[in-house]
């Protein structure tokens, strides 16, 4: 049985990750959720090409959105450079919880342009979370 994944994504890193997820025969992508304010057109095309639901929502922690997510019955959520913070109810909704991939050392570097701020602050080390 395939692992049913909900994919929350934005930007170039998420394109590469989605490509890899789609190639894995042990996984099934239930949907692609893009940022609401400026939905990623590349993700939208990839979702359509692969017959995946493409969704956006301004408040992913709302009761309305949680209702949608329950219907997908995902085993795992994967968040790749997504722009909204997941609250515990959403994180814990899938049986295997949620994996968040972020290009900075949380909670110290949140948001966008993380590498820029690490350089400006003359950090001696840098990581991803």
Name every feature range the model reports, one short phrase each.
Residues 1-129:
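One-carbon transfer enzymes
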């Amino acid at each position: 049985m395939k692992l049913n994944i909900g994919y929350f994504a934005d930007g170039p890193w998420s394109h590469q990750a989605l490509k890899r997820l789609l190639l894995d025969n042990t996984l099934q992508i239930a949907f692609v959720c893009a940022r609401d304010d400026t939905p990623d057109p590349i993700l939208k095309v990839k979702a359509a090409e692969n017959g995946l639901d493409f969704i956006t929502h301004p408040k992913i922690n709302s009761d309305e959105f949680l209702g949608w997510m329950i219907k997908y019955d995902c085993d795992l959520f994967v968040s790749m450079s997504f722009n909204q913070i997941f609250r515990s109810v959403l994180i814990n909704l899938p049986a295997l919880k949620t994996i968040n991939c972020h290009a900075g050392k949380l909670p110290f570097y949140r948001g966008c342009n993380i590498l820029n701020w690490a350089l400006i602050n003359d950090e001696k080390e840098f990581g991803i979370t």
